[in-house]
Amino acid sequence: MAFLWLLSCFALLGTAFGCGVPAIQPVLSGLSRIVNGEDAVPGSWPWQVSLQDSTGFHFCGGSLISEDWVVTAAHCGVRTTHQVVAGEFDQGSDAESIQVLKIAKVFKNPKFNMFTINNDITLLKLATPARFSKTVSAVCLPQATDDFPAGTLCVTTGWGLTKHTNANTPDKLQQAALPLLSNAECKKFWGSKITDLMVCAGASGVSSCMGDSGGPLVCQKDGAWTLVGIVSWGSGTCSTSTPGVYARVTKLIPWVQQILQAN
């Protein structure tokens, strides 16, 4: 019996910090409109990190995929002099138990193209591992064969601008629920700029905006939140009637696995 009890304890530990299952449940209104966003429940997106320069200025988002690795967008231009902040909700508060983590190595996808914005992904190897807790844990990565069909309601999070005209980004982490579009549908807005290395979401009254870049677009699969997109580009005015464009993670997984295995 004691052995069974031990097993059940391990099972609980697994679900506590297993990927894609927040210890603190997110609450979505479903009408959340990050332009027209809503505050997230503190700690409910535990993989969300803030990428900051040495002055503490937030310039991009990212996602923890393990204790040692963060995924973000290549166009963010992350350097080893930048820092990763995990466990943060309110950037205006000094009362949070955040983890400020140094970056040991930056792996920018060598096929990233600044003109086409294809392959917009960078992996960051942390100098010291993040300590997983109730408010810090990993998102699940998809398999290359996973299918997330158009119409799937997903969520993007970030500290990006809530209006493109605002001078400052919000202090509190914002969230927005938004549907995936087919690439054919997305091309009606963006034409030939859309490639199979991208996935679109939104045009539904919500939008990612400047400062959200590199952050997650997550969809639920088998009860766990899975990283489907990385905030990449969109309308310069963060129009909520135009879809945002995200790096399509299923297409980039082979490269991710190659880097993780070699390092």
UniProtKB/Swiss-Prot annotation:
Its EC number is 3.4.21.1. The active site is at H75, D120, S213. The modification Phosphoserine is found at S93. One of its GO terms (biological process) is proteolysis. It catalyses: Preferential cleavage: Tyr-|-Xaa, Trp-|-Xaa, Phe-|-Xaa, Leu-|-Xaa. Its main location: secreted. InterPro entries: Peptidase_S1_PA (IPR009003), Peptidase_S1_PA_chymotrypsin (IPR043504), Peptidase_S1A (IPR001314), Trypsin_dom (IPR001254), TRYPSIN_HIS (IPR018114), TRYPSIN_SER (IPR033116). Residues 34-261 form the Peptidase S1 domain. One of its GO terms (molecular function) is serine-type endopeptidase activity. The keyword Protease applies. Belongs to the peptidase S1 family. This is Chymotrypsinogen 2. It comes from Canis lupus familiaris (Dog). The lineage of its organism: Eukaryota, Metazoa, Chordata, Craniata, Vertebrata.
